[in-house]
Each structure stands twice: as structure tokens, then as C-alpha cells.
């Protein structure tokens, strides 16, 4: 999965600066940003900046394209886990346009990216963090075989000044994940 890969309903591919308008379309949705821990984008320039600094040219980060309508509907990736010093550990993160929630699309994308993380990236562990109220994200992780690891009280200062608890989930390479 160096370039792109397809699932039944999705195309996962590297992001480019030309994706800015599509990224802005879902990044300005209030429920997308707030559940992912970032301020909803207020301008196209914010999305362009995020693409340049966070997404473009990064190994393990992909745009999620819905094959039926051809739209870029989200992002997913595995990066270094800032809460762990293990060099063989990564952290799964994702965001998707709210109009595509509840269809199993993020689970489909996550399963593909996890295969990449444990195979191509040679990771031994992938973690994921979500807010306790984010039941949809927890469900994605559970369907991918993640185990609940613990509660991190007041672990994140969100963009709006709220001090947020997080729940941590973990998936080990030697434990099979659900497909």
C-alpha cells in the first residue's frame, strides 16, 4: 500500500494539496472536528495548512475516497504514538464526513490501514484514543479487534480550553484483528 489500495467501497490514497477543498468540506463540520479533538476549520486556508503540515507526503496517512460518488470523505492514518516511547508502536487516527457515518466505512478503512501498519510499517502495537462520549469511534475500534486499555483522566487540552478525558484502545500484532 505504498500508493493506493482499494476495498469493496473505498479507495485509500495519499493526500495532495489539490485535496484542500474536499478536506475543508468535511473539516468544517462541527461534529467531525469536535469528536477528533480539533477546531472545525473556518477557511479553506486552514485545510490547506493542515494538508501541508500534517497529511501530505507522510507515510501511513491516507485520504478516504468513496468509490460510488468519487468524493474524498475523510482521512485515516497511523503515526508515532506521542504517549508511548516504543519505536514499534503507532497510533491510529481518523476523521470522516458526518454524512458517511454509520455505514461501516471507517471500519473498512481502518482494517486496511491496520494491515499496512503491521505489515509494511512493521509495527508491533497500534493504539487509538477517543473521548468517552464518542461511541461511534469506540465501535470502530471494537469491530477492528482493539482491546480497551484504560482511561486517561484529563489527558488532553482541547482547542476550546476544555480538559478532556480519553479512553485508550490497543491492538497487538500477535493478536488477530477482526475482518
Q: Where are the language model's segments positioned?
A:
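Acyl-donor (CoA/ACP) binding surface of acyl/acetyltransferases
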Residues: 1-31, 61, 65-179
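A short helix-loop-beta-strand connector motif used in the catalytic cores of GNAT acetyltransferases and
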Residues: 51-63
Amino acid at each position: 500500500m505504498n500508493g493506493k489500495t482499494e476495498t469493496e467501497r473505498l479507495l485509500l490514497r495519499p493526500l495532495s494539496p489539490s485535496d484542500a477543498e474536499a478536506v475543508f468540506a468535511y473539516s468544517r463540520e462541527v461534529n467531525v472536528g469536535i469528536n477528533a479533538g480539533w477546531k472545525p476549520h473556518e477557511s479553506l486556508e486552514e485545510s490547506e495548512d493542515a494538508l501541508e503540515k500534517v497529511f501530505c507526503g507522510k507515510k501511513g496517512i491516507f485520504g478516504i475516497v468513496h468509490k460510488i460518488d468519487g468524493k474524498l470523505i475523510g482521512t485515516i492514518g497511523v503515526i508515532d504514538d506521542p504517549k508511548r516511547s516504543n519505536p514499534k508502536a503507532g497510533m491510529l487516527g481518523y476523521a470522516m464526513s458526518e454524512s458517511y457515518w454509520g455505514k461501516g466505512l471507517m471500519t473498512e478503512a481502518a482494517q486496511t490501514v491496520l494491515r499496512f501498519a503491521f505489515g509494511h510499517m512493521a509495527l508491533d502495537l497500534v493504539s487509538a484514543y477517543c473521548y468517552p462520549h464518542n461511541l461511534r469511534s469506540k465501535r470502530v475500534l471494537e469491530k477492528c479487534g482493539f482491546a480497551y486499555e484504560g482511561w486517561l483522566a484529563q489527558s488532553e487540552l482541547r482547542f476550546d480550553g476544555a480538559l478532556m478525558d480519553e479512553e485508550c484502545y490497543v491492538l497487538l500484532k500477535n493478536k488477530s484483528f477482526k475482518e
